[in-house]
């Protein structure tokens, strides 16, 4: 368990931060950009959880824990199999959940406008932020070694959040399609 007696360390005042291997990197480095985007995704999911309960809340809480682990994987340069927290089984779980949720939804006939119920709107925002996290992880992977399961997980997560948003709108009987009245 982590115990912090002080929140500030002053070690980042020069524009650098520490990674878990004790190395220092600039706060604008691709690795820190990716970690920050993952943190933003988790925070957006936390806001969405204000409108959830039961299984949906538990699912989103588990995803937040996964994102914490994903950020921890990103904070470790290199790739050691014993060190990885995000593994293919988590990607497969997201896929199963996507398939299960999608079974109860009507087929898509147009693009979906973000919005609808408050929960759906928050899930769409989390989805868009997760796409930013994905782009940041892809950029990092272009420069350094990244656990391939991280890319798979964050890619599936945006799909998962999209399907959850559709389900939230269906349950709230409030769906928005991208069909303009002409």
PLM feature spans:
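Phosphate/pyrophosphate-binding loop motifs in nucleotide- or prenyl diphosphate-using proteins
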Residues: 1-182
């Amino acid at each position: 368990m982590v115990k912090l007696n002080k929140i500030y360390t002053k070690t980042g005042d020069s524009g650098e931060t520490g990674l878990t291997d004790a190395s220092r990197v600039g706060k604008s480095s691709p690795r820190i950009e990716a970690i920050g985007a993952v943190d933003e995704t988790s925070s957006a999911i936390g806001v969405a959880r204000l409108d959830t309960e039961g299984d949906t809340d538990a699912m989103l809480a588990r995803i937040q824990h996964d994102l914490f682990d994903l950020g921890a994987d990103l904070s470790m340069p290199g790739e050691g199999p014993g060190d990885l927290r995000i593994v293919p089984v988590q990607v497969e779980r997201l896929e199963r959940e996507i398939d299960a949720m999608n079974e109860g939804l009507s087929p898509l006939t147009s693009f979906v406008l973000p919005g609808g119920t408050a929960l759906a709107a928050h899930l769409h925002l989390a989805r868009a932020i997760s796409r930013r996290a994905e782009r940041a992880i892809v950029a990092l992977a272009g420069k350094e070694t990244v656990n391939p399961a991280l890319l798979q997980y964050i890619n599936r997560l945006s799909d998962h959040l999209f399907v959850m948003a559709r389900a939230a709108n269906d349950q709230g009987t409030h769906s928005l399609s991208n069909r303009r009245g002409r």
